[in-house]
């Protein structure tokens, strides 16, 4: 039977596999793609194709990531899988692959291991909202009590990092059996169960266009007789002519009104997420707005200077620092379109941070930036990137 033309009518969700090395993340990724492509169309991927993940760059950092697509009855999924632990750390911190939910793969034969814990912590820190567990290699464990024990351990670990351990779906199976075509409860049926858990447990994400209007300021022009035009790419939401907006960050928050939306030199009624636009602002002077601020729906985002973050520090080979840094290190933090200087406070048990490390830090900026949890940034020194981070919690 010929496959019909691919039509994107189903809602789109981004997911990924996380978990300890050799617990079966890549095998599971291949198994999901293989089982679901047979039912709903799409492309089956072999283990080797996924394992040979191509290199990509995100915020100046090279990351190996494999991208796989598959469909269920209700949705279209884009799934990321990383070959190495360092790739996961970089991927999650840079947001190269934003995840609406993660599939935590844990081997029933081994139970939770150090990277199981670290990936759950990372998911919490970078704002992955939902985790589903696939208890893999269940064909290697005959003892029901042992399986229950491992499940309990995983639930406790999720609880520890503020995920709802008791309510988290845990699917038992064997990715290897499923990939080999086994139709039993640990094979194909387990993949079907996992697909059902993905469909029901991870809510459909809000589309960018449905969010509160936000546009980072890239450039500001003064047009004689017309006023001040601010250009940038709308990050989320919709801006309509005549709406009141706020200018947030760096200085005191100001209110203004959008009196015109321009795109490719044409006047429009509105601009929406993804559009590169110029917005005409009523009564705003050219010197009142600068790169690094944002235009937003009033009250939707506030300026902050003090926050905790999860950061990855580039290794020397990646073009990062050659030496460690210590408490009170003061680099530039690049948020959206501009650099702001800030001071880093290290955790009490950490004397220094080596290139190639990832670490939780506290930051105090010298100027406020429009900020919310989950916002990504780069750490720079003299214009070159030396790290990447994500805001975990706002303090002030």
Swiss-Prot record:
Which residues does the UniProt record annotate as the domain tr-type G?
10-206
Record-linked Pfam families = GTP_EFTU, GTP_EFTU_D2, GTP_EFTU_D3
List the CDD domains: EF_Tu, EFTU_II, EFTU_III
* Binding sites annotated in the UniProt record for GTP: 19-26, 81-85, 136-139
InterPro entries, alphabetically?
EF-Tu_GTP-bd (IPR041709), EF-Tu_GTPase (IPR050055), EFTu-like_2 (IPR004161), EFTU_2 (IPR033720), G_TR_CS (IPR031157), P-loop_NTPase (IPR027417), Small_GTP-bd (IPR005225), T_Tr_GTP-bd_dom (IPR000795)
Chemical reaction(s) catalysed = GTP + H2O = GDP + phosphate + H(+)
Keywords from UniProt, A to Z, are: Cytoplasm, Elongation factor, GTP-binding, Hydrolase, Magnesium, Metal-binding, Nucleotide-binding, Protein biosynthesis
Spell out the residue ranges making up region: G1.
19-26
Report the coiled-coil segments.
none
Task: Report the locations given in the UniProt record.
Answer: Cytoplasm
Q: Mainly localized where?
A: cytoplasm
Ranges for region G2? 60-64
Specify whether Magnesium is a keyword of the entry: yes
Origin, by domain of life? Answer: Bacteria
Report a single Gene Ontology molecular function.
Answer: translation elongation factor activity
Annotated EC: 3.6.5.3
Detail which positions bind Mg(2+): 26
Its function? GTP hydrolase that promotes the GTP-dependent binding of aminoacyl-tRNA to the A-site of ribosomes during protein biosynthesis.
Quaternary structure (record): Monomer.
Q: Which family does it belong to?
A: Belongs to the TRAFAC class translation factor GTPase superfamily. Classic translation factor GTPase family. EF-Tu/EF-1A subfamily.
What is the protein named? Answer: Elongation factor Tu
**Organism annotation:** Paracidovorax citrulli (strain AAC00-1)
